[in-house]
């Protein structure tokens, strides 16, 4: 079973969302294998379909002054924060990896992060009510998935060295009685994404049962607007398929960030 992965560096939420849509179309058509994207976002607050504006506790002027983007998207779930120091993993996987079971998929994703955190002696686990990965009563990683035609997008956000004060701007995932934490806070020392990425990748591959894991490069078909880091590049024209099909082809896919799990074609797993 083959897995491709790519470290995208820092990438805007909108560009990452568009990239996932494109890759999902390619995965649905069988043009690429399961693909794992590792990245971090500039400061952004995302609002799912069940999000309440009251769960954003800072006014728009205050957010803008802090360089925080606000994006309303069509996934399930409520309000979530992403920012520097947070390892984000997006999984463009076919559900055949878990015999079609979304619950099994979520369980394995949580298990991946629990095992990864154990490398640093962090005892993480599951919450009896809320989704995600927790250390005691504090959440260290949020999960959120969308499924279309048996192919997933979205994934997890793990707080590595995240500025936790940013979570005071929102009610994270609508949970008012739970705190948030990070690896850096627990360990009381600096932790980098560079340290954490390979461990998460290894645990993901082992937990999901991939036997062949290989890196893949993303080549923008358009000229970057400013050059430099990949985060400054336009990601609207990308293809991960192999050499026999090098040209990018936009595969039309409908928006699938629908609330609830009542459609075989389009399902979502709220972020939490």
List the predicted regions and their residue ranges.
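N-terminal lobe of the biotin/lipoate ligase/transferase fold
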Residues: 1-135, 139-140, 191, 222-225, ...
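Short, conserved beta-strand/beta-arch hydrophobic-aromatic motifs that form part
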Residues: 56-59, 143-160
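Short, structured patches in soluble enzyme cores that scaffold and shape functional sites
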Residues: 91-93, 147, 158-162, 184-187, ...
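Generic secondary-structure signature for well-ordered alpha-helical cores
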Residues: 118, 205-209
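Flexible, glycine/charged-enriched surface loops at secondary-structure junctions
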Residues: 123-125, 209-218
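Coil-to-beta-strand transition motifs
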Residues: 138-140, 149-151, 162-165, 178
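A hydrophobic, small-residue-rich beta->alpha segment in the mid-to-C-terminal subdomain
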Residues: 165-206
